[in-house]
Structures are given as structure tokens and as C-alpha cells.
Amino acid sequence: MSASAVYVLDLKGKVLICRNYRGDVDMSEVEHFMPILMEKEEEGMLSPILAHGGVRFMWIKHNNLYLVATSKKNACVSLVFSFLYKVVQVFSEYFKELEEESIRDNFVIIYELLDELMDFGYPQTTDSKILQEYITQEGHKLETGAPRPPATVTNAVSWRSEGIKYRKNEVFLDVIEAVNLLVSANGNVLRSEIVGSIKMRVFLSGMPELRLGLNDKVLFDNTGRGKSKSVELEDVKFHQCVRLSRFENDRTISFIPPDGEFELMSYRLNTHVKPLIWIESVIEKHSHSRIEYMVKAKSQFKRRSTANNVEIHIPVPNDADSPKFKTTVGSVKWVPENSEIVWSVKSFPGGKEYLMRAHFGLPSVEAEDKEGKPPISVKFEIPYFTTSGIQVRYLKIIEKSGYQALPWVRYITQNGDYQLRTQ
């Protein structure tokens, strides 16, 4: 069982657009939604599922809109919420910004989309690329000779339409890894992991098949093999285009890609990561007068690599004033609204160490520090480098017309949730 009706409301609870799918819930029931939501909010008991009588309201908020689904019987809640988020995604791809104004400007196309997205309360066609084939931005169906059914009906490859042509055939592949790190005040790594993804931008004619090979040291969990220098990927998720049966047999990632931009796969490595940028800080507080910081930043990756746009965010007391800075490289800025100083280094080569000193005045009567000390956080991006060591060995493009295509591969390592606690 899924949704009876779907509504889009403004912030006051006024219905902008709605679609009744099953006819078993009075459409005026939605008038109870906003009063119940405000009441629960005041009580501090707000929930994503609200109830009035026998009707359930499942809702999400996006910008200045509420998307609400109603149901009278036992609904599959996870399915309904997945559908609501999919509606947001599809509408955003059509209108770029999903907000009250874009709803008011596109009533016709939204009704068409709601008819295709769900049928009798069950999600149907939710792939925006398929929807864009026969629901255009102007809200009129494409007329190309005889009416044709959507790709999902005629084509086994529902994520890619036929007849795509490019003058220049190219594929761009990005291996992006984010490092999550938490270091204790005494320098012990408490938590470290790598969250990676392979993202692609595909501009290829026809119906090409791509084969991607990763380096031999990469293992997928449950391979049953263990090497000391292997990289064992966990929580691997593939785009629907990947032929899983072939992958299960020989670990080849073979697929017919969607057109344009998409995420081919994501993965995680729950492994000990040597901190790429190490921070040591000494903070001296002189009672009722001043506080001094000495912060040392060291890059702990190979000399041939360089971290770009490094930002080191150092928390300072709310009542600090009269800042003075001295640094061996980069620039330092005080951001009083965030109670922090930001040390920016545009280019930070591997194997280097830099120093920054800061001095602040303190009021004679200090505010009591009840919240403890926030950690130092670091932002960075290292091109041509992956922490895990994952590499693309080959990317083959096979298409029956035999055209030549250019594959471009790049690697990026960046910060995720990267924090170092202070003494």
C-alpha cells in the first residue's frame, strides 16, 4: 500500500498543487496538516509522520515548500519518503530551483509529471531522463512522427535513449575520495575512514558498452582473498546500469552508461588513515588579559603532490578581540561571527611544515566556557592523488559503429569531516 494523494504546500499550509491517486481520502484532510505540525513543533515532538483521525501525513520540507503524502491504510513508509525525495529531484532537474515560484509557473508540466511519477498510489516512472523524453519543459509532449511509447516499455536499457549523437565523443571519469578523521587532543587517531565515489560525464553517440578495470590491489568485500597491501572496499554500491552478473563472475565493471552526468559507484574504506595534514596547536591563556595560539601545520603526503585551497579553522573565545597574526605562509582572517580564525594556504606541497601565531585580547571579566573547546577543522583538495591507492587500469569503449572516443581520468582527494581536538 502506498500514497492516497500527494500535495505541495507553501509555508502557510496553502495547497499550491495536489494529485488524488486513490480517492479514498477526503482531499480537504490536508487542512489539518499545518495546525498539527505547528502544535507538535511547539511541544518539541515533531515527527515526519503526523496523524489526524485515520489519516496519516508523511511529509518533507524543501526550501519554502512542504511535500505531503496522505494515506488511510498501512502504507510502506520508506517507499513513500523515497518517492517524495524523488519528486524533489525530478522537479529540481526540470526547474533548477524548486520553490513556490517555480511551482506556480509550471502547473501544467507538474500535473503531467505527477501523472507519470505515480499511478493509483504506486511509484511508476521516476527516472528524469526517461520523463524528459516525452514531457518537455514547455509541458507539451514531443511529436516525432507516430506517437511512441516511453523507453521503459520498448528498451531494456531504460536509463539511456536511442539515437544519441555527438560530434566529439568523450568520457570524463573522476575518482573522488573524502577523508573523515577525528584526532584526540593527545594525538591519537580516534576515527578514520575514506568515502569514495566514481563519477562520470558521458558524451558518447549510440549505445556504447564501457568496461572499467581497476588496479589489482583493489578487492571488493567477500572476495575471500587477503593481501597485506590490498585495498578492500566496503559498502560498494553500483549504478543500475552495471551488469552485476558479470561483476560477480570476474569483477569486470561492464555497463551501458546513461547520457550525461551520473555516479557509477560509491564505496567506503574503514581503515587507518595517516592524517594528510597534521595540526599541532599550543594555546596559552593569560588570565584576564590575552590568549595566544601557536599552530603548526604539516603535510604528510608525498612531495610530488600538492594540496590546494587549504583552510585551517581554529576556534577562538566568543569574547576575544584585538587580533594579531603572524604566519610563515598564506593569510589569516578573524571571523568573529563564527568565533574562529581561518588560516588559508593556497598551495601546500607534500612534506612541508608551516607555522602560524595568533594573539587576542580578552575582557577583564570573562564569559564562563560551558560548551567546551570545539576542534580544529581542516579543508583541502589534493588533485592527482587517492588515499586508498585505487587506480583506473583501463576504460574501454565499445560501440558498433567503431568510432574513436577519448577517455579522461582524474583523481581527487579532499577533506570530509576532518577534525583535530585541542588541549
Curated annotation (Swiss-Prot):
Its main location: Golgi. It holds the Pfam family Adap_comp_sub. Keywords: Acetylation, Cytoplasmic vesicle, Golgi apparatus, Membrane, Phosphoprotein, Protein transport, Transport. It is a peripheral membrane protein. The modification Phosphothreonine is found at T152, T154, T223. Adaptor protein complex 1 (AP-1) is a heterotetramer composed of two large adaptins (gamma-type subunit AP1G1 and beta-type subunit AP1B1), a medium adaptin (mu-type subunit AP1M1 or AP1M2) and a small adaptin (sigma-type subunit AP1S1 or AP1S2 or AP1S3). Interacts with MARCHF11. Subunit of clathrin-associated adaptor protein complex 1 that plays a role in protein sorting in the trans-Golgi network (TGN) and endosomes. The AP complexes mediate the recruitment of clathrin to membranes and the recognition of sorting signals within the cytosolic tails of transmembrane cargo molecules. This is AP-1 complex subunit mu-1. It comes from Mus musculus. The lineage of its organism: Eukaryota, Metazoa, Chordata, Craniata, Vertebrata.
